[in-house]
Design a protein with these regions (language model features):
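Low-complexity, compositionally biased segments
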Residues: 8, 36, 91-93
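Aromatic-enriched hydrophobic runs in primary sequence
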Residues: 12-27, 38, 61, 69, ...
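Active-site neighborhood of glycoside hydrolase catalytic domains
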Residues: 55-116
């Protein structure tokens, strides 16, 4: 989903009383270039992707802060139509860093997202 088209799509789903399961990443899917991650992450010394790397998690937290601030009205607990938010995607076939998954889930919680 691209934005602002994504916001229009969420509003349309809400208007028609359709529920949404959101997949905001950080890794979205193999069908998108680099899984939806920005390629400039590769140029950051010391940054490792999709693991419990503090530099990566810092970038993830900044992304989620911006995203979830805008999504908050659409969350189910706020009367919206987002009923679930996926933590990562296809991670079991890539890695098994449970600390990373817990850290991403905590970033969700820190931003008021509990639908996962």
């Amino acid at each position: 989903m691209t934005f602002p088209a994504g916001w229009m799509w969420l509003a349309l789903c809400r208007r028609h009383r359709l529920y949404v399961i959101l997949r905001p990443g950080p890794y979205i899917c193999a069908e998108m270039d680099f899984g939806g991650l920005p390629s400039w992450l590769l140029n950051r010394p010391g940054l490792a992707l999709r693991c419990n790397n503090p530099l990566f998690l810092q970038k993830v937290a900044a992304y989620y802060k911006q995203l979830f601030d805008r999504l908050r009205p659409y969350l189910g607990e706020n009367g919206g139509n987002i009923i679930a938010v996926q933590v990562e995607n296809e991670y079991g076939s890539y890695g098994n860093d449970k600390d990373y998954l817990r850290a991403v889930a905590q970033i969700y919680r820190d931003n008021g997202v509990n639908e996962f």
